[in-house]
Amino acid sequence: MDRATLADLVVRFTEAFNANDLEGVLALMAEDAVYEEFAGAINRGKAAIRAAFVPQFRGDFGKMRFDAEDLFVDADSGKALIRWVCRLETKRGPAGWRGLDILHVENGLVTQKLTYAKAKVPLLDG
């Protein structure tokens, strides 16, 4: 996969989150993908990843959007890092935090999504 194709995959992956399209997110992930949440939980396989994302996509935490600030891709290793601001609209008003995802990609699919956030404590439970 060349650099432009990898960057495009990361953009489409992020856009699927912003479109609240869980099926679109999962379509870009390998069957045996791993998603490590910033609070430490590790989800292995699409079924576990789906279960981890359902509350977010169902709107349990409010409306969520990830605005990219930086994107670094290494096509030779199939890895990308995207730094973002998560903007959240809740019943109590707007909230947000900064974070990043390290994505490992093989054969055009995300095999690992490692999420890190800039917060003192996890902001979302569940």
At which residue positions do the language-model features occur?
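Short, low-complexity N-terminal intrinsically disordered segments enriched in polar/charged residues
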Residues: 1-31, 124-126
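A beta-strand edge to alpha-helix "cap/lid" segment located at domain peripheries
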Residues: 1-5, 36, 50-126
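Generic signature of intrinsically disordered, low-complexity, basic-rich segments
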Residues: 12, 29, 48, 111-113
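General structural signal for alpha-helix termini and helix-helix connectors
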Residues: 12, 35-38
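Short beta-edge strand/loop motif at the mouth of beta-sheet-based domains
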Residues: 41-51
